Amino acid sequence: MSLTKIKHINKPRHIAIIMDGNGRWAKNRGKLRIFGHKAGVESAKKAIKFAINNHLNALTLYAFSSENWKRPIQEVSDLMELFSSVLNNAIDSFKKNNIRLKIIGDISKFNLKLQKYIKKSEKITYKNNGLNLNIAANYGGRWDIIQGVKKIAKQVKKGIIYPDQINESNFCRFICMNELVPVDLVIRTGGEHRISNFLLWQIAYSELFFTDVLWPDFDHVIFSNAINSFAKRERRFGKINSKCSKIYLKTGDASENSIN
């Protein structure tokens, strides 16, 4: 993936990617699915370099969903070994590139070796202040919200907070990535047009970009296209756009030439 820099004033700060298509990529080449996952790791490395070069604040990669346990046992086993190997070998690169790594998801379900690598990688990179790299592993958006509810329920039980004090602002402190800037853009590869239980709370106002390109073929061109698409959009967050606002001030009717 090229290190081409994107020059935009309206550039996303936090991009999340649903990395879909590894298995189909391998099948198209007559290979086992694990070959697709290994190729996907290389695409992830290139995407991280691209994010660093373009000064993103955060990049979140959806690596393994809570639903992926339903896949064949051998594939799951291969993925766990691959994840362990990648983490163990990437620590020096994370330090060199000032990357702060965070694994979001229920890591208690992983084997002890993988849990050890996760904790080690997070500890070593904790003080880095460059790219915030989040890897969603054994993650589900519903799980995230539920574990947040459980945490805030404990606060209520202890009398730290009262039920009528709970609002969006303080609830979001109990879910993943609460310390980071919001997700501006979600990219999904592989041709599917859905979010697959990914960051349900965090992407409430995110822009979405879908591409038919399978993840191992994802490159700087597609990444740039996604950012360019984002830069052209007007994010209204429930408000009307500036043109409609002027019409409304004049006529009291914002329906002309507007999209609801």
UniProtKB/Swiss-Prot annotation:
Binds 2 magnesium ions per subunit. It is an enzyme of class 2 (transferase). Mg(2+) binds at D20, H193, E207. The keyword Magnesium applies. Its cofactor is Mg(2+). InterPro entries: UPP_synth-like, UPP_synth-like_CS, UPP_synth-like_sf. GO terms for molecular function: ditrans,polycis-undecaprenyl-diphosphate synthase [(2E,6E)-farnesyl-diphosphate specific] activity; magnesium ion binding. It catalyses: 8 isopentenyl diphosphate + (2E,6E)-farnesyl diphosphate = di-trans,octa-cis-undecaprenyl diphosphate + 8 diphosphate. Its EC number is 2.5.1.31. Keywords: Cell shape, Cell wall biogenesis/degradation, Magnesium, Metal-binding, Peptidoglycan synthesis, Transferase. The keyword Magnesium applies. PANTHER family: DEHYDRODOLICHYL DIPHOSPHATE SYNTHASE 2, DEHYDRODOLICHYL DIPHOSPHATE SYNTHASE FAMILY MEMBER. NCBIfam families: uppS. Catalyzes the sequential condensation of isopentenyl diphosphate (IPP) with (2E,6E)-farnesyl diphosphate (E,E-FPP) to yield (2Z,6Z,10Z,14Z,18Z,22Z,26Z,30Z,34E,38E)-undecaprenyl diphosphate (di-trans,octa-cis-UPP). UPP is the precursor of glycosyl carrier lipid in the biosynthesis of bacterial cell wall polysaccharide components such as peptidoglycan and lipopolysaccharide. Belongs to the UPP synthase family. HAMAP family: ISPT. This is Ditrans,polycis-undecaprenyl-diphosphate synthase ((2E,6E)-farnesyl-diphosphate specific). The gene is uppS.
